[in-house]
Structures are given as structure tokens and as C-alpha cells.
Amino acid sequence: MALERTFSIIKPNAVANNNIGAIYARFESAGFKIIAAKMLHLTKEQAEGFYAEHKGRPFFDGLVEFMTSGPIMVQVLEGENAVQRHRDIMGATNPDNALAGTLRADFADSFTANAVHGSDAVESAQREIAYFFAADEIFPRS
């Protein structure tokens, strides 16, 4: 298995519901190392830039509005097969379809307020990490 990095967001609803610690505990108990993290309140421009691939889709404006509604946590996770394993831990995008014990089953409030975001491929992880973190803000640990 390959050591990978993935990008993760704890969305405004999960931050507002004080779920940061519980979600971080799940990451660490799954074997991930959190090698970068910070709290942000996205501007409209930042959210539109991050989700640019969805511009023009019917859910875009609502997604931007939600993602700018309160603070978020952004983090870089490192571990074996990190991208796919993180997606497995998150659960289905629609929390109604998420398996019990996944982050979205446990912490989502709705389809949009689904608690977490995670990169869908190694290439998107690299792009998303670079969007929020400079190289000197990432601290690999052995």
C-alpha cells in the first residue's frame, strides 16, 4: 500500500455542533496522522474557487452559501491508501445512504450539511491541499 495524503473539511454544521474532536478521534483511530489543520471562515470567493468544478450546477449556490455560513476545519491526513480510506470513513455523500458508523451517518444534518468533505482522488487531494495550505504549513510526522 502507498502512503498518501488526502484533504478533508469538517463542514460548518459539524463545527457548530462541536463535533471536531469526535471526528479527529475517528481519523486518528483509523490510523491517519493529521499533518496540517486550521480553522477558517470561507469567503464567498474562496468557496466559489474551491468548488469551481460545480459552477453552473443546480446545487452550486446553496453549497457556497452553506460553506460560508460558519467556520470550517481544513486538514491534511496522511496514511496508507488515505484517499479511499478517508472516503470509506466519511460514508455516502447522501447521509440517508451512509452506512452506520460512518462520519456522515453520525454527524450529518442533511444532504448539503453532510458534515465532511474529502478528496476523491490523489490528484484532487494535491490540488485541494495546495488551495488551503502552503508547503511550510504541512508537518509530516514519523
UniProtKB/Swiss-Prot annotation:
It comes from the Bacteria. The keyword ATP-binding applies. GO terms for biological process: CTP biosynthetic process; GTP biosynthetic process; UTP biosynthetic process. PROSITE patterns: NDPK, NDPK_LIKE. One of its GO terms (cellular component) is cytoplasm. Its cofactor is Mg(2+). GO terms for molecular function: ATP binding; metal ion binding; nucleoside diphosphate kinase activity. Belongs to the NDK family. This is Nucleoside diphosphate kinase. The lineage of its organism: Bacteria, Pseudomonadati, Pseudomonadota, Gammaproteobacteria, Enterobacterales.
